A protein has these predicted regions:
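A cross-family signal for N-terminal binding/gating loops and helix N-caps
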Residues: 3-141, 145-184
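Conserved small/polar residues in nucleotide/adenosyl-binding loops
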Residues: 186-193
Length: 194
């Protein structure tokens, strides 16, 4: 991305801008890339299959997330690098997550797949208590001791284009971040990327 395009996106009000660099990787499979680069807690590997028979075009490899959101019994915890930095008691965890997500203004760029980061994780069966008022007060023993909701803020990922063997290395930056110049330098096209 050129600096002029980046500045234009800032003027349009975007505050979570994906910067990317593409490289051709024709000797590693998406799974091999995951095992080499992201096989850590709070990382993920998503493959797609169409119709149960054909591989989808993209594979998504989320590098270890710095920020993780956990919800249990109307309590929302935000962890950064494994430490709780915020804890809230909320009336509606799903509304809270929607509000949290709305703080990120992310442009959709033609050069990237539709999914290029965001909230990734799970919503467990127990969230029905947050949706159906009649079930809100049912106390059930938590045998698994896992959050009702766990979401990773996926800022850094690889998107493997299985059709072209190209890997998009993506990081999302906030225009107010101090390391912005380093990110722009890193993602600027080099002569060999042509």
């Amino acid at each position: 991305m050129k600096k002029s395009q980046f500045n234009s996106l800032i003027k349009e009000g975007y505050n979570h801008i994906p910067l990317s660099r593409g490289v051709v990787v024709d000797t590693d499979t998406p799974l091999a890339l995951y095992l080499k680069l992201a096989n850590n807690p709070y990382s993920y590997f998503l493959e797609s299959v169409q119709g149960g028979e054909k591989w989808g075009r993209y594979s998504f490899i989320g590098l270890a997330a710095e920020t993780v959101i956990k919800v249990n019994d109307y309590e929302v915890r935000i962890e950064k690098n494994g430490k709780i930095v915020h804890k809230y008691e909320v009336e509606d965890p799903l509304a809270w997550i929607e509000e949290y997500q709305n703080q990120f203004k992310v442009p959709q760029l033609d050069s990237l797949p539709d999914f290029n980061g965001g909230l990734v994780g799970y919503f467990g069966y127990e969230i029905v208590r947050y949706i159906e008022p009649k079930l809100a007060n049912i106390n059930k023993t938590d045998e698994l001791n896992v959050p009702d909701i766990l979401l990773m803020v996926s800022n850094d990922l690889l998107v493997v284009d299985n059709l072209t063997s190209k890997v998009h290395i993506i990081t999302h930056v906030n225009p107010n971040d101090e390391s912005l110049e380093d990110c722009l330098l890193y993602t600027s096209p080099s002569p060999r990327d042509s």
